[in-house]
């Protein structure tokens, strides 16, 4: 007979998960198939080659612009530097997750199907109120998926703002120059400052201006897929892990309940809880191994980008307020990007800290010798909370987030002082 919990997990697996779906599509657009059970990986290699060629072409064009204007002023090419960093990090992320695509797809599969909770044996025990227990566990999981969808789609909307700005800016600029300013000559400008190399063959250019224009237009889209796709994947995995810990906390809290768990079943019930703890610990280690080094890269680059944006904001305040809206959206996107890592990791850590107290507060002192022994062992194991590290150097937390922003502010002050001199 199939476990009731397994049956419920299959039902939840079939429910639409908008946030995770967009994450999968974003990764797939870069040639990284993190959900092979849903779609084929046949053309992923070709997609990655195409994405790499296009991204390197755009990066080369941006670097060419930076070198051309290097001696003028930093304000002239700061936007090109920002985009170069974003595209470069996107390429690094693409290769990183492709190298770990098996681990990544396994985590996504485990998260979506509830593999960690399957075959626990909990609902094969002789419990009087299995329905109540099952509905409570199911409610925790469903609410957790709702939170995941809300967070991911909120980040989706934020990341879309600078992408839309870059995509529509040349068209609005063209309308303004030709019809509002009433210039004698007007032409379509490039999406952002860049020098795309081309060959002049008589009256023809290769690649043509149209191709160069749309090449640069694709840049913000590649940034979107890398920023949204892989950062939101971290949110999905860690949020789901915190949901698993919530389920375990609920089970531990009721391990000595006379209503839900009879006294003769408590040792077996607690064994199921211990089994779940071991699985969550293994799941956590997989997330840690997948993200710890790429988070270090992301935090370092985000710190530099925030510093440059602060500098750009200071120059805009002096020159005018025309670009302030766009720069603030860009700033919010990058700040939110690094904040999501820390807030999601902090949530997991907070839940694991609460789990330690739940093991201790479950009235274990009135139970059997075997029950007491298992509780003591779990108190020993759960003293070490589930933390996610930054390259193995420090842990993601609210404290680390403050340090990143403080470091960015210090770099900004240093940059401004150097420029003034």
Curated annotation (Swiss-Prot):
An example Gene Ontology molecular-function term: olfactory receptor activity
A cellular component annotation (GO) from this entry: dendrite membrane
Coiled-coil ranges (or none): none
Transmembrane segments: 49-69, 72-92, 152-172, 218-238, 290-310, 316-336, 385-405
One of the GO biological process terms: detection of chemical stimulus involved in sensory perception of smell
Family: Belongs to the insect chemoreceptor superfamily. Heteromeric odorant receptor channel (TC 1.A.69) family. Or63a subfamily.
PANTHER family: ODORANT RECEPTOR, ODORANT RECEPTOR 19A-RELATED
Note: The atypical heteromeric and topological design of the odorant receptors appears to be an insect-specific solution for odor recognition, making the OR/Orco complex an attractive target for the development of highly selective insect repellents to disrupt olfactory-mediated host-seeking behaviors of insect disease vectors. Odor-evoked OR currents are independent of known G-protein-coupled second messenger pathways.
Name by which UniProt lists this protein: Odorant receptor 67b
Species whose genome carries this gene: Drosophila melanogaster
Name of the coding gene: Or67b
